[in-house]
Structure formats: C-alpha cells, structure tokens
Amino acid sequence: MSTFGATIAFSKTVDKEIAKHASSVFLDAVIAPDFDPDALEILKKNEALRIIKLITPYKTIRTMQEQEVHITPFGTLVQETDNKELDKDTFKVVSKTKPDAEMIEDMVFAWKIAKHVKTNAVVVAKDFKTLSIVGGQTSRIDAVETALDRACDGAKKAVIACDGFIPAIDSIQAAAQCRIGGIIQTGGTHKDKDVVDAANKYEIAMITTGIRHFKH
C-alpha cells in the first residue's frame, strides 16, 4: 500500500509532531477528532490538503452501522457489521514459545488492521508499523507468502496477523523461513494441533483469538 495521495484518519487529537510527519508526504486529506493549534498551522501550509474535523465522537461512529449490505448479480447479502474487539484477557497463547509484552502489542495492532482488510487477509507488522498488508487472496498460503515477500528482510522477528484460522502447516513453514517471531490467528480448526506443533517446532509464538473476521 502507498501513502502517496492517501487519506490519513486519526482517532485522537493531532499534535505538532504528528502534523510534521503528515506534512512530509503527499496526502489528499487528514481526518481527526481535533487538531492542536500548532498542528493546524503546519497542515494549512499545504493549501491542497483537506483538513477535516470530526463532530460525531469516534466511539459513536464505530457503533452507528449495525449492518452491511452488498448487492451482487445473484442477490443481496445483508450481514452484521464486524464490531468485534479483541480482549487481551480472553485470547489464548497456544504455543510453547511465549510472546513478550511488546510482541503481544504488535499482534493486537496487526489484528486490528487485518479486521478491515478483505479476506483472505494477512498483515505483517513490527514495532507498531505495518510491513505489508495483503488482502483478497483466494487461499491463506497465497496471502501469507505474498505478505512475507513484500515485507522482505523486515520480517525477521515480526508478527503475522490472519483474519481467519490457519488451515495447514504450510503457512507456518513459510513464516519460519522468514524468521517470523509470532502469529495471531482465529484458531478452531480440526488441524489446530498440527498448526501449533509446527509453531512449536520453529519456536514461533502463537495466539488464537476465537474471532473470525472474513471481510467480504
């Protein structure tokens, strides 16, 4: 994904430092609940930049839409909006290798992003930065391999987030070749034991969430 000509949305007030970073790349718009005066001064130097302040509270926006409607040549699909939140108290560390606090934060960060990517979705992240985002693949292994290829050398000790379960060990083997440190996925298939055993073999930390996103 490219930031060139993109729109950046923030869930918190944009301060001076954030504005400096945002103004260093070409953007079409910046959206946030509020802007510090210094931040506004910096952003307004770009006359072509659209600066949008949210009036409706962010939490309200997140819960406003209860259903999604998709119209196809074969009919209309109506489904509940995916408003599921990941609870750190309910996910399970299923591997022998345990993720440290920083890795868990990266896993949760990547998982939140994968939620909004078209399935099959895979996100590779490290240090609160996305290294690659891949979506719309027809198989999990294709999504994993493409994401790892885009992440390149940065994948070492990074984490992978999948929007659904990992159905086979081939994804674990691909992750091991790139020295991935941790994987967060839904879990819950009849091959879970094989997948966890493979993670243990390659000393990869694994978390299962019990939540499947599968954005269509």
Stretches with model-predicted labels:
Residues 1-216:
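ATP-dependent carboxylate/acyl-activation modules
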